[in-house]
């Protein structure tokens, strides 16, 4: 066991990006208080980190095959220590959420419960687990919006929808990449039932929904936004359509489609941030 293992198991890069996204969402929704952005960053960081810890705890047998280098299967963190660590992080996140407002506190509590149920149960149910992750990713925008006020909820809805559908597509493709390890670990995923090709078709459909939703902010941000998001949308579509060429998880993994899709989603987030900055200063 090691302290470094307890830091690694929260997946700080993943959790940190989620925290930064919450701060950006607050700014896009019209927030102006830097301290609130820091508070949101902390809440999302620790709650997301706790969820990652629980995932590793329940995925121990699968990770022995897929990711033996992770903290629990490698022995850097004990299973019991992981549960305690997750509890501490969840408690810290909920406690910090008490300093926001009733709407944000409600989202934090719902997400904590969902993260626990997801790790223990939903993750093993085909497609339901993917839907849970997609909601949790999109809810970061709702969290940032509600801190500004209930009226900002409507501002965040298109961004929630874009993130929801984009994440859903990526999660399905990730499951398609992990078919062999998931099968050996006893997991049940949608790609195991319908195959890589049909999963890729579903991913393309959900990406198309995300692209359609991405046009809605044009009503607020205008032509410049439309041009920028159009470039990002084209990249995301091309990457996802490329997945249709592959019949096996090995081919899909080698293509790096999920990695490029992640880059495209980051680019979309940058466009949202840029447009809000331009709206404030121009």
Swiss-Prot record:
E.C. number: 2.5.1.42
Any GO molecular function: magnesium ion binding
Membrane topology of the entry: Multi-pass membrane protein
EC supergroup of this enzyme: transferase
Subcellular location: Cell membrane
Metabolic or biological pathway: Membrane lipid metabolism; glycerophospholipid metabolism
Transmembrane segments: 27-47, 76-96, 97-117, 127-149, 154-173, 201-221, 223-243, 261-281
GO biological process: glycerophospholipid biosynthetic process
One cellular-component annotation, GO: plasma membrane
Catalytic activity reported: sn-3-O-(geranylgeranyl)glycerol 1-phosphate + (2E,6E,10E)-geranylgeranyl diphosphate = 2,3-bis-O-(geranylgeranyl)-sn-glycerol 1-phosphate + diphosphate
Gene3D superfamilies: UbiA prenyltransferase
Domain of life: Archaea
Swiss-Prot/TrEMBL cofactor(s): Mg(2+)
Pfam family, one: UbiA
Keyword entries, A-Z: Cell membrane, Lipid biosynthesis, Lipid metabolism, Magnesium, Membrane, Phospholipid biosynthesis, Phospholipid metabolism, Transferase, Transmembrane, Transmembrane helix
Signal peptide: none
Chain's role: Prenyltransferase that catalyzes the transfer of the geranylgeranyl moiety of geranylgeranyl diphosphate (GGPP) to the C2 hydroxyl of (S)-3-O-geranylgeranylglyceryl phosphate (GGGP). This reaction is the second ether-bond-formation step in the biosynthesis of archaeal membrane lipids.
Family under the similarity heading: Belongs to the UbiA prenyltransferase family. DGGGP synthase subfamily.
NCBIfam families (alphabetical): PRK12882.1
The protein's name: Digeranylgeranylglyceryl phosphate synthase
Annotated organism of origin: Methanocorpusculum labreanum (strain ATCC 43576 / DSM 4855 / Z)
């Amino acid at each position: 066991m090691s302290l470094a293992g307890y830091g690694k198991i929260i997946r700080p890069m993943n959790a940190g990006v989620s925290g930064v996204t919450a701060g950006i969402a607050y700014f896009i929704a019209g927030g102006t208080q830097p301290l609130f952005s820091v508070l949101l960053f902390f809440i999302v960081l620790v709650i997301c980190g706790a969820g990652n810890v629980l995932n590793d705890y329940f995925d121990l047998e699968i990770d022995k095959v897929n990711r033996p280098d992770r903290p629990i299967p490698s022995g850097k963190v004990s299973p019991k220590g992981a549960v305690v660590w997750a509890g501490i992080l969840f408690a810290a996140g909920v406690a910090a959420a008490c300093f926001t407002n009733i709407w944000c506190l409600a989202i934090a509590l719902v997400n904590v419960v969902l993260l626990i149920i997801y790790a223990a149960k939903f993750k093993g149910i085909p497609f339901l687990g993917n839907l849970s992750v997609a909601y949790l990713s999109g809810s970061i925008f709702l969290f940032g919006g509600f801190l500004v006020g209930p009226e900002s909820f409507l501002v965040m809805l298109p961004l929630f929808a874009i993130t929801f559908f984009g994440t859903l597509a990526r999660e399905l493709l990730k499951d398609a990449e992990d078919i062999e390890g998931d099968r050996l670990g006893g997991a049940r995923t949608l790609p195991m039932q319908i195959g890589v090709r049909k999963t890729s078709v579903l991913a393309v459909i959900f990406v198309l929904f995300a692209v359609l939703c991405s046009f809605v902010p044009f009503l607020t941000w205008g032509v410049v936004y439309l041009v920028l998001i159009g470039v990002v949308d084209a990249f995301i579509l091309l990457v996802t359509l490329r997945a249709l060429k592959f019949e096996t998880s090995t081919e899909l993994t080698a293509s790096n489609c999920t990695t490029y899709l992640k880059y495209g989603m980051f680019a979309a987030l940058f466009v949202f941030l840029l447009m809000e900055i331009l709206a404030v200063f121009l």
